[in-house]
């Protein structure tokens, strides 16, 4: 990827693929990733946020308690898709039954479809992937919230200090603002 990267993966990624998804320390590619199982890339990095599905043990107010009843295993994300450079005129969508693992690539009869330059296809995939990503990022943040207890009430700030992170160079929020909203 030269500009941005969104991915949803199931499990057991090849080391080379995991390394490529993580990227280098000095690149400014924005990355969003959702993996079914926690790995070394889970969390927030300089230009990226990676999350895993979180099963909430207790219900949130107004929601039912969740259950794995009737489900075999712990697969919550089984979408296997990588989209690169989706905000450009030359995106690439990689999708199929291959889960980017060694066995899928070497011994299983799996497939991958590579769609290049089709902005409409990239838009559709990224929209669905970001829907899943935002949903599970909320759950991941609730599940990994430090301190536990009830979070404080959210209120509007009386001044504009809440915007500081969007103007701090090298922050993910800065790169998101510049990339998706407007140049400085």
Predicted features, each with a name:
Residues 3-4, 14-184:
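PLD/PLD-like phosphodiesterase catalytic module centered on the HKD motif
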Residues 10:
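C-terminal active-site-proximal or functional interface alpha/beta core segments in diverse enzymes
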């Amino acid at each position: 990827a030269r500009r941005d990267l969104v991915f949803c993966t199931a499990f057991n990624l090849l080391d080379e693929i995991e390394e490529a998804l993580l990227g280098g320390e000095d690149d400014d590619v924005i990355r969003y990733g959702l993996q079914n199982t926690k790995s070394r890339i889970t969390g927030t990095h300089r230009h990226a946020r990676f999350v895993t599905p979180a099963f909430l043990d207790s219900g949130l107010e107004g929601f039912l308690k969740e259950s794995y009843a009737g489900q075999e295993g712990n697969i919550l994300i089984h979408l296997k898709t990588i989209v690169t450079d989706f905000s450009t005129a030359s995106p690439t969508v990689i999708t199929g039954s291959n889960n980017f693992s060694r066995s899928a690539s070497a011994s299983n009869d799996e497939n991958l479809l590579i769609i290049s330059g089709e902005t409409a296809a990239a838009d559709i995939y990224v929209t669905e992937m970001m829907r899943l990503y935002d949903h599970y990022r909320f759950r991941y943040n609730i599940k990994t919230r430090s301190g536990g207890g009830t979070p404080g009430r959210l209120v509007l700030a009386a001044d504009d200090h809440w915007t500081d992170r969007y103007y701090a160079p090298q922050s993910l929020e800065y790169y998101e603002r510049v990339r998706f909203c407007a140049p400085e």
